[in-house]
UniProtKB/Swiss-Prot annotation:
Region entry Disordered, spans: 111-132, 249-299
SMART domains linked to this entry: B3
GO cellular component, one term: nucleus
Pfam families per UniProt: B3
CDD domains, alphabetized: B3_DNA
Subcellular location: Nucleus
Protein name per Swiss-Prot or TrEMBL: B3 domain-containing protein REM5
Coiled-coil stretches: none
Length: 352
């Protein structure tokens, strides 16, 4: 089965980085505001919604700034300096909001425990019935202006090592056509070593990488509690999941993790320190954050901004090169036509 190609989403959207002082307001880009909002909608209220919460957040719009109500949305979604937020306009001043972490992956939120108890586990084995699978919280569509959404983060647990089975966020799998049936894939580490594997989907909607996971972790000395990021390489024949980040050598051993967690009420979410071992939780804690260092957040922000600047410069450079090549081809055609016309003119003079 061929993977769907990336394409620009139909819904107009914009993204903004989360910078210091972000809790008081966030700006709508002037160009987006002029094109999609100004003079087209009455009132000064926008509505924000995110996938893990069924609640709609009312936020006041003053000019092209979101102000009153924005702080509550920020705190409910645990947004931090270094994150990016993508606003997708669904019409009638309703925006679906996606949080992107400094690693350029979608931020994952743990579902409420009541949700875990209600969701059935089929075809995965009896041992997985007590396993808490953390689902992807937001659904976004990548485009040329968005962060890289071809990656997702995962944690190593005793359970997924033993079963040689590791989860993939549902929306990620759906985006690339991996959410139905089975698909052959290849796991690749940073050294280029590969392991044959496959993606399996189940009636419950869960999607897993089956096979090769334990071998990859062993070869790369990944241990329980470590986290890693996979990037999907769009191979036309067999999808390749490449390991593109892993814990640095010498890092502090097993710091406490902080998840972004949805409260059981289904409304706001609360931050808390997860002090249990990951294998006791029974599932991966994706895109979790160390509870320390504002300086670390600032470094991640600088790295993320550098990546975007580099990508933008590369695109501009490629665009300039393409334009120059087109000009050269056009000039060559003009020269050819000029020579042909001169030859024709000379031939006409000779006949006269």
């Amino acid at each position: 089965m061929k993977n769907p190609t990336l394409f620009a989403p139909k819904s107009p959207h914009f993204f903004q980085p989360i910078l210091p002082g972000f809790k008081s307001h966030i700006k709508i880009p002037v160009k987006f505001f002029s094109k999609h909002i100004e003079g087209k909608h009455e009132g000064n209220t926008v509505y924000l919604r995110s996938y893990p919460s069924r609640r709609t957040w009312k936020v006041k719009m003053e000019g092209h700034k979101l102000t009153e109500g924005w702080k509550e949305f920020v705190e409910a979604h645990d947004l931090r300096v270094g994150d990016f937020v993508v606003f997708k306009h669904k019409g009638d001043m309703l925006f679906h909001v996606t949080a992107i972490g400094p690693s350029c992956c979608e931020v994952q939120y743990a579902p409420s425990r009541s949700h875990d108890r209600n969701e059935e586990s089929d075809e995965i084995g009896e041992s997985s019935r007590n396993e808490k699978i953390i689902e992807e919280n937001v659904k976004t569509e990548p485009d040329q202006f968005s962060p890289d959404l071809t990656c997702f983060s995962q944690s190593v647990t005793a359970s997924n090592l033993t079963r040689d089975l590791v989860g993939i966020p549902r929306d990620f799998a759906k985006r690339y056509g991996l959410n139905i049936g089975r698909h052959e894939i290849v796991l690749m580490d940073e050294e280029g070593n590969t392991w044959e594997s496959e993606v399996k989907s189940y009636k419950s909607g869960r999607v897993f990488i089956a096979g090769g996971w334990t071998s990859l972790c062993t070869a790369n000395k990944l241990e329980v509690g470590d986290s890693c990021t996979f990037k999907l390489l769009r191979n036309p024949k067999i999808p390749v999941f490449r390991l593109c980040s892993r814990p640095k050598a010498g890092a502090e051993a097993r710091p406490h993790k902080r998840s972004r967690v949805q409260s059981s009420s289904g409304g706001s979410r609360q931050k808390h320190d997860v002090r249990q071992k990951l294998d006791e939780e029974g599932g991966p804690s994706r895109c979790t954050r160390s509870s320390n260092k504002a300086t670390g957040d600032q470094e991640k922000l600088q790295q993320t901004q550098s990546c975007f600047i580099f990508d933008h410069v590369a695109k501009v450079k490629q665009s300039v090169e393409d334009t120059l090549n087109s000009i050269r081809r056009f000039r060559a055609k003009l020269e050819t036509k000029e020579h042909n016309l001169e030859a024709l003119l000379q031939e006409t003079k000779t006949k006269l």
